[in-house]
Amino acid sequence: MKKVLLLVSLVTALSSCGGGGGGGGSSQTGSTTPVPNNPNQPGNSNAQNPTQPGNNQPGNSSAQNPSQPGNNQPGNSNAQNPSQPGSNNPSQNQITGKGVSVAVLDSDFISPDVHTNQLYHKESYLGEILDREFKDRFIQETKSSDPNRNNLSKNNHGIIVATILGGNSGTGATGAKIHGVSVSQGSGFYLDVNKYQELQNKGVRIYSHSFGSQKSFRENPNYREEFRIYLRTLTESILTTENDRRVDVLTNFYKNAVNEGSLFIWAAGNRRFDGTNMNGVSVQAGLPYYIPSLYKGWIAVMGVRPDGREYSPYFARADWTSLQEGVNSAKWWTVAASGDCEIDGCTEYGSSFATPKVSAAAAKIKEKFPWMTGHEIQQTILTTATDLGDPGVDNKFGWGLLNERKALKGPAEFSNELLVGESAARNGAKGQFNANIGDNITSKFENDITGLGGLRKSGNGTLILAGKNTYQGSTDIESGTLEIQKENGSPITIKSGGTLITTPTTIIGLKNSHYDNFSPVNVKNEGGTLENRGSGAVITGNYTATAGSVTKAEIGSKLIVNGSVNLNGGNTTLQTLSNGRYITAKSLSSTIIEAKNGINGNFDKMKTPELIKGSVEKTDNQINVKLSRKNILEYAKETKADEMQQNTAQNIESAFQKLDEEIENGKAGNLSSFEKKAATLQALDLTNRAAILDSLSGQIYASAQALTFQHSQTVNKDLSNRLVMLGTLDNVGDNFGLWVSSFGANGKLEQNGYGKGDTKVFGGQVGIDKQFGDNLILGTALSYSKADVKFNRYGGKSDASNFGVSLYGRLGNKDIPWYLQGRFGVGFVDSDVERDIILSSNDYSRAKINHNDKVYSGYVETGYDIKNSNGDFVVTPFAGITHDTVARGSFSEDKSQFGLKADKKNYSQTSALAGVRVGKAVQWNGGSKTTFQGYVTHQRAFNDEDLSFKAEYSGLPGSSFKVKGIGLSKSKTKAGVGALTEVNSSFGWYVNYDGEISSGKGKGNNNVVTTGLRFNF
């Protein structure tokens, strides 16, 4: 609340002091505008600065200040009515000028003791205002490099102007970066070219000036003389030759800056020193009258009431002194805007406060259309203004009242007077609006565009014309894309780097409003691309395609040409595009071009989407295509796809055959969603083919089962190592033994032609066992682990939680050479699977499902210990049989039409193994014993389990096919080392490493590290 009161106090103080003749209120009309007050003079709060010429002229007192509420002017109560044309409506338009730099050249932004500061005795007040209104968006520019400029005005006019333009309390460009440039010197102003150039080098391209001479641009033909007071310091007296030189330096900067895309926005002015009306904009605002090349980067802003009516007495008009049509009239670069301050508590008005509204609009346009230079921004602001006064561009209001909302929809006219200048336009020159749109940028012009000028589309970006356009100049698409959505009355030429897109509502023709018909307009394709989307587009004239041109047509679309189609020269291409329509294996014939006056020539070649084959046929006035889909498996083989991709292609082909059958039998009504996605899939291209086929493989549901088998064998090996350990213990416990272990494993699942999976397993077991008699030990164990696998090639990932129960036993002890040991276990697996399903570069989804599995495991091993005479070294040949059964639960990927749905499936593998183990016991002085062990074993399965399963796509019931993945390896070689230390009769610890290498179909490896403790009781 304190800061709000401070701001109100600021604007109240400013209002009582006068805002500036070129801008805020008539209290400054007796001087160069805006004229700051001298706060050091007692009682000067309501008087003009007496040092200014003409200040003693009658009528130049506060009595002329029209800033009081109401001001006896009807309609002024609507000064802040957001419904007025051009007002900013944040709920409808969130464009704020973000990222755009605007320079505000005005009175004083840097003096620490500005007027309000003195009134409130708060040295930090200026900083508080700037911080609250702009935060880090305000840059206080340094003073001029001229050492003689050290007498700043200490006036708040510039802060108010900047706040209207971009402050948080205003409705302007609240996201723009504001460069506050203090150009005041005492009660005047100093234009420093070096400061201009510094701003230009910082990237500033929009310059806002709320000051200027109080003579209209036509009053003194020697405009250089009017610049004298702006190009010298207070103490200087310069000769005419020096003044002319300085003017040349300044105007040369303006010329160069305009050519670099800058836009200079000037207050038109209020009234003369003597209080009389200005019938033309100020000399500065009217500079293009003297230097015509500046026309494309200049705007003069006239201050009017919010509803467009003039104040009484009126402020500077556009060019009222030249009622006849004169060359370089300022009306061509003049626009009107509300001159009300429009900040709470501020009742000042004038062209000073109209100017920042136009500057704010320019910043917002620059944000929305970042490719626009000052010339395009100027045209957009001027041509979208709401007409005032006489119809069209007039000498009073210029183009009319600023309409920011409309301006943010793009230009409304391609005017030759703005494109090439008034003089050139009078001599018949025509210009083109240059839409030079950069890469990855799409802009839309929503206004109906009129005018005699044309359009040049350059740059690789896209421009969409969404209005009903009647501009008559030529349209040249040199590069990038132009999309026409409605009517367009301009002849179009598509150059080699350009693309024209037409839609079902496109009409290339000039609308005759009196007769409600269209005059013929031609389209010429000179090596570029015409792309017709949907049926209904009309070219009212002729369509000509020359050598190297491409004509694209969506499947099922038709382009109507009221004239003739001329396919001239060689190497013309017809290319069909997917439009969401599925093509069956049965041939489909459709007309893509129909010409009322016939077709001359034919296309030399035809291109279709990757999965579509077609041919072209020409009749007298039609071009028809016949299309059918390719066999997906044959296509995959032709492109040398690997095994996984060919399997995917076979599955898609099976589904498409089912879909074809349903369509031909008229039973596809419930399959429309799947049919649409199938059409999307048919549009794949070389850039995304591999990704699509990989993602649709579903291999993870097959391949991930290999991890379940691998995990079961990891648990099995941990228990096997414990059983071997029991055969070496001197003491297994009088009552029972308790052990706990933890293990970690990482490995790979891989097979030629499939995605590779990286596996990780972390878990542990806890067990208890008891010796029965001298030779038998029985026990039970619980295990819990987390296992995950991530596949490349869009295979997805699986995270599984495993809980298991095992029973184990060993017959034989360290004193008996022969032993028999085994284990039986049941595991419960909770698996979460995620994978991407890609149908096109823009159509992809992520499937997330859960399935619950069970694992049944059994292992039996027998061996014989061969010991040395000391009994501390042993060699043990052994053999065994292992069996695992995985019962995978059912799952359904319902969120995608091409998601997989499968019933539960059982997988089993039984293997035999043989190996040899060696051990060496070492007795330590403290009584402890460590047994070092190592082993190698080879395992071979009796069956070849490939882990494939039957599935169907969730969007196409009955489309059964086989999903394949990495199979189980038939042969594995394992090796390991470990150490068991019996610290005493009650406690021991152990560590093991086990490595596994698979060979054959399912190649891979696994590395397991196990540690554990044992307690005897």
Label each region the model flagged:
Residues 106, 286-367, 371:
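Extracellular S/T/G-rich loop segment that most often corresponds to the catalytic His/Ser-adjacent loop
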Residues 491, 500-589, 912:
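Extracellular beta-strand/loop-rich repeat segments of large surface/secreted proteins
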Residues 153-156, 168, 181-293, 344-357:
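Substrate-binding/access-modulating region of protease and related hydrolase catalytic domains
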